[in-house]
From Swiss-Prot:
Name this protein carries in UniProt: UDP-3-O-acylglucosamine N-acyltransferase
Pathway assigned to this chain's UniProt record: Bacterial outer membrane biogenesis; LPS lipid A biosynthesis
Pfam families noted in UniProt: Hexapep, LpxD
Role noted for this protein: Catalyzes the N-acylation of UDP-3-O-acylglucosamine using 3-hydroxyacyl-ACP as the acyl donor. Is involved in the biosynthesis of lipid A, a phosphorylated glycolipid that anchors the lipopolysaccharide to the outer membrane of the cell.
Source organism of the structure: Chlamydia trachomatis serovar L2 (strain ATCC VR-902B / DSM 19102 / 434/Bu)
Residues forming the catalytic site: 247 (proton acceptor)
Length: 354
Protein backbone atom coordinates (compact mmCIF):
# COMPACT_ATOMS: atom_id res chain seq x y z
CA UNK A 1 0.00 0.00 0.00
CA UNK A 2 1.76 3.14 -1.21
CA UNK A 3 -1.09 5.64 -1.45
CA UNK A 4 -1.57 8.43 1.10
CA UNK A 5 -5.33 8.11 1.69
CA UNK A 6 -7.22 4.95 2.63
CA UNK A 7 -10.80 4.06 3.34
CA UNK A 8 -11.73 2.56 6.70
CA UNK A 9 -12.50 -0.72 4.95
CA UNK A 10 -9.10 -0.76 3.21
CA UNK A 11 -7.31 -0.12 6.49
CA UNK A 12 -9.26 -2.86 8.26
CA UNK A 13 -8.23 -5.28 5.52
CA UNK A 14 -4.59 -4.15 5.65
CA UNK A 15 -4.45 -4.37 9.45
CA UNK A 16 -6.42 -7.65 9.50
CA UNK A 17 -8.96 -6.34 11.99
CA UNK A 18 -12.74 -5.91 12.03
CA UNK A 19 -14.42 -2.54 11.70
CA UNK A 20 -17.69 -0.92 12.72
CA UNK A 21 -19.03 2.16 10.98
CA UNK A 22 -18.81 3.74 7.55
CA UNK A 23 -16.29 1.71 5.57
CA UNK A 24 -16.00 4.49 2.96
CA UNK A 25 -14.60 7.01 5.49
CA UNK A 26 -11.30 8.36 4.12
CA UNK A 27 -8.27 8.50 6.41
CA UNK A 28 -4.96 10.20 5.66
CA UNK A 29 -3.06 10.58 8.94
CA UNK A 30 -2.65 9.73 12.61
CA UNK A 31 -3.22 11.81 15.74
CA UNK A 32 -3.83 11.62 19.51
CA UNK A 33 -7.41 10.88 20.48
CA UNK A 34 -8.19 14.33 21.91
CA UNK A 35 -6.74 16.20 18.91
CA UNK A 36 -7.76 13.92 16.03
CA UNK A 37 -9.92 15.29 13.19
CA UNK A 38 -12.13 13.51 10.67
CA UNK A 39 -9.24 12.41 8.42
CA UNK A 40 -7.22 10.99 11.32
CA UNK A 41 -6.98 7.53 12.79
CA UNK A 42 -6.27 7.24 16.52
CA UNK A 43 -6.33 4.58 19.24
CA UNK A 44 -7.44 3.92 22.79
CA UNK A 45 -5.08 1.81 24.88
CA UNK A 46 -4.96 3.53 28.25
CA UNK A 47 -8.42 3.81 29.83
CA UNK A 48 -7.43 7.23 31.24
CA UNK A 49 -8.15 8.59 27.76
CA UNK A 50 -11.58 6.97 27.44
CA UNK A 51 -13.09 10.28 28.59
CA UNK A 52 -12.17 11.70 25.15
CA UNK A 53 -14.01 8.99 23.19
CA UNK A 54 -17.39 10.67 23.05
CA UNK A 55 -16.05 14.07 21.96
CA UNK A 56 -13.31 12.80 19.64
CA UNK A 57 -13.64 13.89 16.01
CA UNK A 58 -11.39 11.06 14.78
CA UNK A 59 -12.35 9.35 11.55
CA UNK A 60 -11.51 5.98 13.11
CA UNK A 61 -10.49 4.72 16.55
CA UNK A 62 -8.56 1.50 17.16
CA UNK A 63 -9.83 -0.29 20.28
CA UNK A 64 -9.61 -3.75 21.82
CA UNK A 65 -12.51 -6.21 21.78
CA UNK A 66 -13.07 -5.66 25.48
CA UNK A 67 -13.25 -1.89 24.99
CA UNK A 68 -15.58 -2.34 22.02
CA UNK A 69 -18.10 -4.12 24.24
CA UNK A 70 -18.12 -1.06 26.52
CA UNK A 71 -18.26 1.64 23.82
CA UNK A 72 -19.98 0.00 20.85
CA UNK A 73 -23.09 2.18 21.28
CA UNK A 74 -21.13 5.35 20.54
CA UNK A 75 -21.66 6.60 17.00
CA UNK A 76 -18.01 6.08 16.00
CA UNK A 77 -15.96 4.29 13.37
CA UNK A 78 -14.07 1.58 15.24
CA UNK A 79 -11.26 -0.75 14.22
CA UNK A 80 -11.49 -3.72 16.59
CA UNK A 81 -8.39 -5.74 17.45
CA UNK A 82 -7.58 -8.79 19.54
CA UNK A 83 -4.08 -7.48 20.29
CA UNK A 84 -2.85 -4.24 21.81
CA UNK A 85 -4.43 -1.19 20.10
CA UNK A 86 -1.04 0.51 20.39
CA UNK A 87 0.61 -2.23 18.31
CA UNK A 88 -2.02 -1.91 15.58
CA UNK A 89 -1.68 1.89 15.67
CA UNK A 90 2.07 1.46 15.15
CA UNK A 91 1.35 -0.21 11.81
CA UNK A 92 -0.70 2.87 10.86
CA UNK A 93 2.16 5.15 11.90
CA UNK A 94 4.52 3.32 9.58
CA UNK A 95 1.92 3.49 6.82
CA UNK A 96 1.33 7.24 7.00
CA UNK A 97 4.74 8.51 8.17
CA UNK A 98 7.70 7.54 6.01
CA UNK A 99 10.97 6.94 7.91
CA UNK A 100 13.87 9.18 6.84
CA UNK A 101 17.39 7.80 6.48
CA UNK A 102 20.67 9.72 6.64
CA UNK A 103 21.25 9.68 2.89
CA UNK A 104 24.61 7.93 3.28
CA UNK A 105 24.21 4.41 1.88
CA UNK A 106 27.05 1.92 1.95
CA UNK A 107 30.42 2.67 3.54
CA UNK A 108 31.27 6.37 3.50
CA UNK A 109 34.83 7.25 2.38
CA UNK A 110 35.49 9.19 5.61
CA UNK A 111 34.80 6.12 7.76
CA UNK A 112 38.00 4.70 9.26
CA UNK A 113 38.10 0.91 9.14
CA UNK A 114 41.11 -1.07 10.36
CA UNK A 115 42.41 -3.55 7.77
CA UNK A 116 41.87 -6.47 10.16
CA UNK A 117 38.21 -5.60 10.77
CA UNK A 118 35.57 -7.82 9.18
CA UNK A 119 32.64 -6.06 7.53
CA UNK A 120 29.93 -8.36 6.20
CA UNK A 121 27.53 -7.67 3.31
CA UNK A 122 24.95 -4.87 3.08
CA UNK A 123 26.47 -2.83 5.92
CA UNK A 124 26.03 0.94 6.14
CA UNK A 125 28.83 2.87 7.86
CA UNK A 126 28.17 6.62 7.98
CA UNK A 127 30.73 9.48 7.89
CA UNK A 128 33.58 9.53 10.42
CA UNK A 129 32.67 6.26 12.09
CA UNK A 130 35.62 4.18 13.32
CA UNK A 131 35.89 0.39 13.27
CA UNK A 132 38.98 -0.79 15.19
CA UNK A 133 41.24 -3.79 14.77
CA UNK A 134 39.68 -7.26 14.60
CA UNK A 135 36.18 -5.84 15.08
CA UNK A 136 33.40 -7.75 13.33
CA UNK A 137 30.29 -6.02 11.94
CA UNK A 138 27.54 -8.43 10.88
CA UNK A 139 25.46 -8.25 7.72
CA UNK A 140 22.81 -5.54 7.27
CA UNK A 141 24.13 -3.51 10.22
CA UNK A 142 23.99 0.28 10.36
CA UNK A 143 26.80 2.20 12.07
CA UNK A 144 25.95 5.89 12.59
CA UNK A 145 28.17 8.92 12.08
CA UNK A 146 30.98 9.33 14.59
CA UNK A 147 30.37 5.99 16.27
CA UNK A 148 33.24 3.78 17.40
CA UNK A 149 33.34 -0.01 17.30
CA UNK A 150 36.24 -1.02 19.54
CA UNK A 151 38.93 -3.62 19.00
CA UNK A 152 37.80 -7.26 19.06
CA UNK A 153 34.17 -6.19 19.44
CA UNK A 154 31.34 -7.77 17.47
CA UNK A 155 28.06 -6.33 16.24
CA UNK A 156 25.43 -8.90 15.27
CA UNK A 157 23.35 -8.94 12.09
CA UNK A 158 20.67 -6.29 11.52
CA UNK A 159 21.78 -4.18 14.49
CA UNK A 160 21.38 -0.40 14.31
CA UNK A 161 24.02 1.73 16.02
CA UNK A 162 22.97 5.39 15.96
CA UNK A 163 25.43 8.33 15.70
CA UNK A 164 28.08 8.97 18.35
CA UNK A 165 27.76 5.64 20.11
CA UNK A 166 30.95 4.30 21.70
CA UNK A 167 31.31 0.53 21.84
CA UNK A 168 34.61 -0.13 23.57
CA UNK A 169 36.97 -3.08 23.10
CA UNK A 170 35.87 -6.71 23.60
CA UNK A 171 32.16 -5.94 23.61
CA UNK A 172 29.69 -8.41 22.12
CA UNK A 173 26.52 -6.94 20.59
CA UNK A 174 23.86 -9.46 19.51
CA UNK A 175 21.50 -9.49 16.54
CA UNK A 176 18.82 -6.83 15.96
CA UNK A 177 20.15 -4.64 18.76
CA UNK A 178 19.31 -0.91 18.68
CA UNK A 179 21.62 1.55 20.47
CA UNK A 180 20.57 5.22 20.55
CA UNK A 181 22.95 8.22 20.25
CA UNK A 182 25.47 8.94 22.96
CA UNK A 183 25.38 5.53 24.63
CA UNK A 184 28.69 4.16 25.89
CA UNK A 185 29.09 0.40 26.16
CA UNK A 186 32.15 -1.05 27.87
CA UNK A 187 33.66 1.80 29.88
CA UNK A 188 35.79 0.85 32.87
CA UNK A 189 33.73 0.34 36.01
CA UNK A 190 33.86 2.63 39.03
CA UNK A 191 36.21 0.45 41.04
CA UNK A 192 38.87 1.83 43.40
CA UNK A 193 40.98 0.71 46.34
CA UNK A 194 41.75 3.27 49.03
CA UNK A 195 45.33 3.16 50.31
CA UNK A 196 46.43 3.58 53.91
CA UNK A 197 47.16 7.22 53.01
CA UNK A 198 43.61 7.84 51.79
CA UNK A 199 44.46 7.81 48.10
CA UNK A 200 42.05 6.16 45.64
CA UNK A 201 43.72 3.82 43.17
CA UNK A 202 41.71 2.80 40.11
CA UNK A 203 41.42 -0.91 39.36
CA UNK A 204 41.70 -1.87 35.71
CA UNK A 205 38.54 -3.49 34.39
CA UNK A 206 39.39 -6.17 31.85
CA UNK A 207 36.09 -8.02 31.62
CA UNK A 208 33.59 -7.78 28.77
CA UNK A 209 30.10 -6.49 28.10
CA UNK A 210 27.68 -8.90 26.45
CA UNK A 211 24.48 -7.51 24.92
CA UNK A 212 22.24 -10.31 23.70
CA UNK A 213 19.78 -10.34 20.77
CA UNK A 214 16.87 -7.87 20.47
CA UNK A 215 18.07 -5.55 23.23
CA UNK A 216 17.41 -1.80 22.92
CA UNK A 217 19.58 0.78 24.69
CA UNK A 218 18.54 4.43 25.06
CA UNK A 219 20.44 7.66 24.47
CA UNK A 220 23.31 8.50 26.84
CA UNK A 221 22.98 5.23 28.71
CA UNK A 222 26.21 3.70 30.05
CA UNK A 223 26.98 0.03 30.62
CA UNK A 224 30.35 -0.59 32.28
CA UNK A 225 32.56 -3.62 31.70
CA UNK A 226 33.32 -6.03 34.52
CA UNK A 227 36.60 -5.99 36.39
CA UNK A 228 37.34 -9.60 35.44
CA UNK A 229 33.89 -11.09 34.73
CA UNK A 230 31.25 -9.86 32.29
CA UNK A 231 28.42 -7.33 32.43
CA UNK A 232 25.45 -8.90 30.66
CA UNK A 233 22.11 -7.67 29.30
CA UNK A 234 20.02 -10.68 28.34
CA UNK A 235 17.80 -11.18 25.31
CA UNK A 236 14.93 -8.78 24.66
CA UNK A 237 15.55 -6.32 27.48
CA UNK A 238 14.81 -2.63 26.89
CA UNK A 239 16.81 0.16 28.54
CA UNK A 240 15.69 3.80 28.49
CA UNK A 241 17.81 6.96 28.23
CA UNK A 242 20.31 8.03 30.90
CA UNK A 243 20.53 4.69 32.69
CA UNK A 244 23.71 3.65 34.53
CA UNK A 245 24.53 -0.07 34.67
CA UNK A 246 27.70 -0.71 36.64
CA UNK A 247 30.41 -3.38 36.32
CA UNK A 248 29.45 -7.06 36.41
CA UNK A 249 25.71 -6.36 36.54
CA UNK A 250 23.48 -8.96 34.92
CA UNK A 251 20.08 -7.92 33.55
CA UNK A 252 17.74 -10.83 32.81
CA UNK A 253 15.63 -11.51 29.75
CA UNK A 254 12.83 -9.15 28.66
CA UNK A 255 13.32 -6.70 31.51
CA UNK A 256 12.71 -2.95 31.26
CA UNK A 257 14.75 -0.18 32.90
CA UNK A 258 13.28 3.34 32.81
CA UNK A 259 15.25 6.61 32.54
CA UNK A 260 17.75 7.72 35.18
CA UNK A 261 17.75 4.42 37.04
CA UNK A 262 21.09 3.25 38.42
CA UNK A 263 22.27 -0.27 39.21
CA UNK A 264 25.43 -0.70 41.29
CA UNK A 265 28.07 -3.33 40.62
CA UNK A 266 27.64 -7.12 40.69
CA UNK A 267 23.86 -6.99 41.10
CA UNK A 268 21.74 -9.57 39.28
CA UNK A 269 18.37 -8.50 37.87
CA UNK A 270 15.91 -11.29 37.04
CA UNK A 271 13.74 -11.89 33.99
CA UNK A 272 10.70 -9.71 33.19
CA UNK A 273 11.66 -7.12 35.80
CA UNK A 274 10.49 -3.49 35.45
CA UNK A 275 12.65 -0.83 37.10
CA UNK A 276 10.95 2.58 37.35
CA UNK A 277 12.52 5.95 36.62
CA UNK A 278 15.21 7.20 39.02
CA UNK A 279 15.22 3.93 40.94
CA UNK A 280 18.50 3.13 42.66
CA UNK A 281 19.71 -0.41 43.33
CA UNK A 282 22.68 -1.15 45.56
CA UNK A 283 25.44 -3.56 44.58
CA UNK A 284 25.95 -7.29 45.22
CA UNK A 285 22.24 -8.18 45.54
CA UNK A 286 19.71 -10.18 43.52
CA UNK A 287 16.28 -9.15 42.23
CA UNK A 288 13.80 -11.99 41.57
CA UNK A 289 11.91 -12.50 38.32
CA UNK A 290 8.69 -10.50 37.73
CA UNK A 291 9.51 -7.71 40.18
CA UNK A 292 8.14 -4.22 39.45
CA UNK A 293 9.85 -1.23 41.08
CA UNK A 294 7.98 2.05 41.23
CA UNK A 295 9.73 5.31 40.33
CA UNK A 296 12.45 6.44 42.76
CA UNK A 297 12.51 3.13 44.60
CA UNK A 298 15.66 2.65 46.68
CA UNK A 299 16.66 -1.01 46.87
CA UNK A 300 19.17 -1.81 49.63
CA UNK A 301 18.86 -5.60 49.85
CA UNK A 302 17.83 -8.54 47.68
CA UNK A 303 14.20 -8.94 46.63
CA UNK A 304 13.29 -12.62 46.61
CA UNK A 305 9.58 -12.56 45.75
CA UNK A 306 7.80 -11.20 42.65
CA UNK A 307 5.51 -8.23 43.17
CA UNK A 308 5.33 -4.44 43.18
CA UNK A 309 7.81 -2.55 45.36
CA UNK A 310 8.40 1.13 46.13
CA UNK A 311 9.83 3.59 48.61
CA UNK A 312 13.29 3.85 50.15
CA UNK A 313 14.18 1.38 51.43
CA UNK A 314 12.06 -0.69 49.07
CA UNK A 315 8.94 -2.28 50.55
CA UNK A 316 5.94 -4.11 49.06
CA UNK A 317 3.39 -1.75 47.54
CA UNK A 318 0.62 -2.88 49.90
CA UNK A 319 2.74 -1.87 52.89
CA UNK A 320 3.51 1.51 51.34
CA UNK A 321 -0.18 2.04 50.60
CA UNK A 322 -1.05 1.40 54.26
CA UNK A 323 1.68 3.78 55.44
CA UNK A 324 0.52 6.51 53.07
CA UNK A 325 -3.04 6.10 54.36
CA UNK A 326 -1.80 6.46 57.94
CA UNK A 327 0.17 9.59 57.08
CA UNK A 328 -2.93 11.11 55.48
CA UNK A 329 -4.84 10.43 58.68
CA UNK A 330 -2.24 12.13 60.90
CA UNK A 331 -4.07 15.51 61.05
CA UNK A 332 -7.25 13.83 62.29
CA UNK A 333 -5.24 11.68 64.68
CA UNK A 334 -3.57 14.83 66.03
CA UNK A 335 -7.00 16.39 66.65
CA UNK A 336 -8.16 13.26 68.48
CA UNK A 337 -5.03 13.22 70.66
CA UNK A 338 -5.50 16.91 71.48
CA UNK A 339 -9.13 16.25 72.44
CA UNK A 340 -8.08 13.29 74.60
CA UNK A 341 -5.41 15.40 76.31
CA UNK A 342 -8.02 18.04 77.18
CA UNK A 343 -10.32 15.32 78.52
CA UNK A 344 -7.51 13.87 80.65
CA UNK A 345 -6.74 17.34 82.00
CA UNK A 346 -10.40 17.81 82.97
CA UNK A 347 -10.52 14.41 84.66
CA UNK A 348 -7.32 15.16 86.56
CA UNK A 349 -8.76 18.50 87.69
CA UNK A 350 -11.96 16.79 88.91
CA UNK A 351 -9.89 14.15 90.69
CA UNK A 352 -7.90 16.81 92.54
CA UNK A 353 -11.13 18.56 93.66
CA UNK A 354 -12.33 15.35 95.29
Amino acid sequence: MSQSTYSLEQLADFLKVEFQGNGATLLSGVEEIEEAKTAHITFLDNEKYAKHLKSSEAGAIIISRTQFQKYRDLNKNFLITSESPSLVFQKCLELFITPVDSGFPGIHPTAVIHPTAIIEDHVCIEPYAVVCQHAHVGSACHIGSGSVIGAYSTVGQHSYIHPRVVIRERVSIGKRVIIQPGAVIGSCGFGYVTSAFGQHKHLKHLGKVIIEDDVEIGANTTIDRGRFKHSVVREGSKIDNLVQIAHQVEVGQHSMIVAQAGIAGSTKIGNHVIIGGQAGITGHICIADHVIMMAQTGVTKSITSPGIYGGAPARPYQEIHRQVAKVRNLPRLEERIAALEKLVQKLEALSEQH
